[in-house]
Amino acid sequence: MSKKSDKSGSGKTGVGVGDGQRRGDRMRERVKTARGRKLSSTRWLERQLNDPYVAAAKKDGYRSRAAYKILEMDDRFKFFKPGGCAIDLGSAPGGWAQVAAQRLGAKTDKGFVAAIDIQDMEPIAGVSFLKLDFLDDKAPELVRELAGRRADIVMSDMAAPLTGHRQTDHLRTMALAEASAWFAFEALKPGGAFCAKVFQGGTSGALLNDLKNRFGNVMHMKPKSSRKESVELYVIARDFKG
């Protein structure tokens, strides 16, 4: 921290050396902040350019690298069966919905995918998009009416906007996971599955107990396609008891 200087400059201007220093300090802080933003943006761009899943998503026609996470989890747990019904909460930009539509046969067979988001989402062949808040009490009923049946899987890749404070980010994303689970309880058919993003630290005790009471099998998984530095995990619950 710079020491305060005596105002020994010309009294005619009304600006002392101390005022000039403070202005200089403020300007340097602005420059440092601007540089930090530029460096952060550069690092993000470098990470994107060097990420094999970003390149693969462009090549394979997926809207986001997140598509490979649900592909990996489905390869292991077999969520998507041809002719089944899936609900994607917080679906934009649509990577998970794309995978669900492909694997359920939503374009040609009797598979059905409902994608829900409060943001706009570009249309996807075989996907029925609903622009609404899934927290609305009537949302599960609206989706059931649209699909004409209950879902085989309810999935959510939602995360709250990051604040940089780890505990706050964890709690906010956990709140979304809990709300998604309650939606699933209303929308799933017996034997169905639930998959949602959480952060390291795992699922809260209350939610974990609810899931264990409602499903036959509950576990966590971090897909290989998740970035190594990411704190995300996925809670996977199968064999819904109804």
Identify the residue ranges that each predicted region occupies.
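Conserved SAM-binding loop of SAM-dependent methyltransferases across substrates and taxa
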Residues: 93-108
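Short glycine-dipeptide loop
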Residues: 83, 107-110, 188-193
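Conserved class I S-adenosyl-L-methionine
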Residues: 81-92
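Class I SAM-dependent methyltransferase Rossmann-like catalytic core
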Residues: 2-82, 101
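S-adenosyl-L-methionine
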Residues: 109-112, 116-163
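Glycine/threonine-rich flexible loop motifs
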Residues: 162-173
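A short glycine-rich, Lys/Arg-flanked "PGG" loop and its adjoining helix->strand segment in the class I
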Residues: 174-190
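Class I S-adenosyl-L-methionine
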Residues: 200-242
